[in-house]
Amino acid sequence: MVSKNSWRSYVNSNVSTQQLKLDADAIKYSIEIDQNVIAKHHGISRKRIEIVAWPAVVSACCFKSNLIVHSHSKCLTNTKFDFRIMDKFNQLGGIKYGHTPGCENKLGHCAEQRAANDLLYKMRDRKRKIKDISFSKAFRPRTMKEISMCDNCCYVFDK
């Protein structure tokens, strides 16, 4: 869990209010996921929850459209990526089942890529660019450890 002192030092750094809200939203979502996983594991929840312990959670936001989307990292299933993201994937060699050169993460598996994809589909604005998307920090739901953006995501989102 994030301690009050570490959160205060983070808040006191020169971070925009919008970015703080986005990061707080990602933390809230991470805690919610972790509690659902614990409830499922211990049989507390009566409703059937198909949630697993995801390795990373992130929130993506386009401040110009006021949309915020949460997502998590997971294996590829029949996910159809937006053409803007696919163009960047193709520049990196396309979606494969192996690792891309220079990065341990597989294309399409990262929380940032999934959140951006969901956001671009919800915006339905073809003029928006990938660089307009802002991301929260990625967190591990169980430990609340902050995860840095991988090389693939840095390339795809020009960060």
Task: Label each residue range with its predicted role.
Residues 1-159:
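Zinc-dependent deaminase catalytic domain
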